[in-house]
């Protein structure tokens, strides 16, 4: 409810970038309209998603100078910053978000209203796909609820904490997704050890993703310039070491056997990956183990005891039931915004616009320009250029303030704030990814476009329609891949998203390989689709303000936060992504594939030959 406020309250909001009255807006969780309430915070989070490059004194000068995309001139390195980020993904590193919450509890009185909003955010994060867009939105909304309850009354703000690197997007991922620090646990020490083992494995894979780029760059990276650089941009995908174009920088990807698992820095991760089945066993959803570890709601427990179904089967049944309900009501999500009136409700598509901003010009969403047309620009390229400009401007502005503060104190500026430090803008905002790396292979990148789009309900439904069209396109034994492009070409005939052409433009830009990978090949994509709980993500809280507050209060009073997919399946997905970045030798690869396929089938989840996706895509 909007009400008159003092000029002092308004000034406090404006000094932190919030639009007047923004902090009075009721919090409903994963609300796309919130992104328009603070442009400064949006720029800050975009900047926080980038690596920082500093001069490499050991690097020999390059003959070709700085490339046109600003990726570096051969004298800069991102390894040091990547190592700092990698150290966040460790069990013996305190969670940054937990530390923030602890500091607030020490300094300020605990507010019941804040507890309710925080509980809703935690609840929603367990029903959202793991992707860059979700990370960004979660960080933004965490800052929103903290400022909503503590900025007007106490002058405490989260705006600027990410930009000054007091908090990292990796902390957000660790708190809300990789570890789930707020999740109640039952079963005592044994269950906590099992969950810590899970956290160790998934964080180790995230850590390896960052350091795998570091290793690839230090061993074979070269500045992309001249004819050699142009050849690298268009190098075909295949086996063995190859070069992939990632937002203007050339990075190496690896083929089977070209692994780095024997180095001291990755040996513990290598051992954990070999033990993935042992880590998964106590946390999987089979038989008696279903109730061990994470505390589940009474409804979940009753359902699990009545019907012997895996988490995958339960999730699929819930999704089909929701679709039937929408059909019966004639309330398809696409009908919520009339055709031709997309621009009348632009806030509805802000998540899609954010996805384009985060992925444009990277290996996950390349800027495709037909050379025969003579064109030099395309929408994806323009979005990427705007993002890079925003990131560089933010860095220059904040770095100037920090260096001035340090000069006043007679100190040298921190290592990553010196005059020679600059954001690796050409690599893109890879730190928003749960597995942060810029590698590309086979027309795919580290971020899946379709996983990101599923954060919007209309797109979740449209992707399910797209998959059904691909599957049902031919009655003959044609390849599923052959049905992707025709189904995309006819997309507007069966998926009336009324989004101003956003989704279709993105689907055409990403290409059929990335779509095929998401729909049929990659276990992480398949599990991401199942992780989305429509009733939680889009069906709560109630639209009535009083009912919504009661709903949030009940969540805070009985915090049974759990996702639909068991952690055993997630362990498999992260192990798969690790081997996708650096496939093991054929014997080890064969052993893993057989075990993984058996595990997926036992859950009722079918994917096309895992060895194809593991060696062909990334």
Curated annotation (Swiss-Prot):
Chain intervals for the UniProt region annotation (Zinc finger 2): 448-525
Keywords for the protein's UniProt record, in alphabetical order: Host cytoplasm, Host nucleus, Metal-binding, Zinc, Zinc-finger
Segments of this protein annotated with the region Zinc finger 1: 95-181
Subcellular location(s) per record: Host cytoplasm; Host nucleus
GO CC list: host cell cytoplasm; host cell nucleus; viral envelope
InterPro entries to which the protein is assigned, alphabetical: Herpes_env (IPR002597)
Family matches, as Pfam families: Herpes_env (PF01673)
Residues binding Zn(2+) 1, per UniProt: 95, 98, 175, 181
Primary subcellular site in the record, as a coarse category: host cell
GO molecular function, one term: zinc ion binding
Residues that coordinate or bind Zn(2+) 2: 448, 451, 518, 525
Family to which this protein belongs: Belongs to the herpesviridae UL32 protein family.
Function: Plays a role in efficient localization of neo-synthesized capsids to nuclear replication compartments, thereby controlling cleavage and packaging of virus genomic DNA.
Record protein name field: Packaging protein UL32
Native source organism of the sequence: Psittacid herpesvirus 1 (isolate Amazon parrot/-/97-0001/1997) (PsHV-1)
Lineage: Viruses, Duplodnaviria, Heunggongvirae, Peploviricota, Herviviricetes
């Amino acid at each position: 409810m909007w009400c008159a406020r003092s000029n002092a309250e308004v000034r406090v909001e404006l000094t932190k970038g919030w639009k007047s009255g923004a902090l009075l807006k009721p919090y409903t969780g994963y609300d796309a309209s919130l992104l328009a309430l603070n442009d400064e915070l949006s720029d800050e989070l975009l900047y926080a998603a980038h690596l920082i490059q500093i001069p490499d004194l050991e690097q020999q000068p390059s003959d070709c100078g700085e490339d046109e995309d600003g990726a570096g001139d051969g004298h800069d390195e991102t390894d040091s910053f990547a190592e700092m980020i990698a150290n966040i993904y460790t069990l013996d590193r305190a969670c940054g978000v937990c530390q923030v919450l602890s500091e607030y509890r020490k300094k300020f009185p605990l507010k019941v209203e804040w507890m309710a909003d925080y509980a809703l955010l935690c609840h929603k994060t367990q029903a959202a796909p793991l992707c860059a867009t979700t990370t960004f939105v979660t960080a933004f909304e965490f800052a929103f609820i903290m400022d909503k309850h503590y900025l007007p009354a106490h002058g405490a703000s989260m705006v600027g904490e990410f930009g000054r690197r007091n908090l990292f997007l990796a902390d957000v991922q660790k708190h809300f997704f990789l570890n789930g620090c707020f999740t109640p646990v039952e079963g005592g020490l044994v269950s906590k050890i099992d969950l810590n083992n899970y956290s160790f494995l998934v964080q180790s894979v995230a850590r390896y993703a960052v350091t795998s780029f570091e290793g690839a760059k230090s061993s074979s990276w070269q500045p992309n310039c001249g004819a050699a650089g142009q050849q690298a941009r268009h190098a075909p995908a295949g086996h063995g070491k190859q070069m992939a174009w990632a937002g203007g920088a050339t990075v190496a990807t690896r083929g089977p056997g070209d692994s780095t698992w024997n180095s001291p820095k990755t040996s513990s991760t290598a051992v954990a990956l070999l033990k993935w089945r042992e880590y998964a066993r106590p946390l999987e959803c089979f038989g008696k183990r279903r109730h061990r570890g994470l505390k589940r709601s009474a409804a979940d427990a009753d359902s699990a005891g009545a019907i012997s179904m895996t988490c995958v089967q339960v999730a699929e049944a819930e999704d089909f039931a929701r679709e039937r309900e929408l059909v019966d009501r004639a309330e398809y999500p696409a009908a919520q915004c009339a055709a031709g009136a997309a621009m009348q409700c632009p806030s509805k598509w802000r998540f899609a616009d954010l996805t384009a901003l985060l992925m444009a010009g990277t290996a996950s969403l390349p800027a495709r320009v037909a050379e025969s047309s003579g064109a030099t620009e395309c929408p994806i390229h323009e979005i990427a250029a705007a993002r890079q400009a925003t990131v560089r401007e933010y860095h220059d502005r904040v770095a100037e303030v920090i260096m001035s503060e340090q000069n006043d104190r007679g100190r040298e500026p921190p290592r990553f704030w010196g005059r020679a430090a600059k954001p690796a803008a050409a690599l893109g905002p890879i730190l928003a990814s749960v597995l942060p790396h810029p590698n590309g292979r086979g027309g795919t990148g580290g971020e899946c476009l379709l996983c990101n789009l599923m954060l919007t309900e209309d797109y979740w439904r449209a992707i399910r329609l797209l998959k059904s069209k691909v599957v049902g396109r031919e009655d003959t034994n044609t390849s599923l891949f052959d049905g992707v492009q025709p189904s995309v070409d006819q997309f507007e005939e069966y998926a009336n998203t009324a989004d101003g052409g956003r989704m279709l433009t993105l689907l055409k830009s990403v290409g059929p390989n990335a779509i095929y990978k998401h729909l049929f090949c990659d276990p992480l994509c398949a599990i991401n689709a199942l992780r989305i709980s429509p009733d939680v993500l889009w069906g709560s809280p109630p639209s009535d303000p009083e009912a919504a507050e009661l709903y949030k209060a009940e969540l805070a009073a009985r915090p049974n936060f759990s996702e639909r997919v068991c952690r055993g399946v997630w362990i498999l997905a992260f192990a798969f992504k690790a081997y996708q970045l650096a496939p093991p030798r054929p014997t080890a690869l064969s052993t893993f594939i057989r075990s993984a396929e058996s595990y997926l089938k036992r859950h009722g989840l079918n994917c096309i030959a895992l060895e194809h996706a593991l060696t062909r895509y990334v």
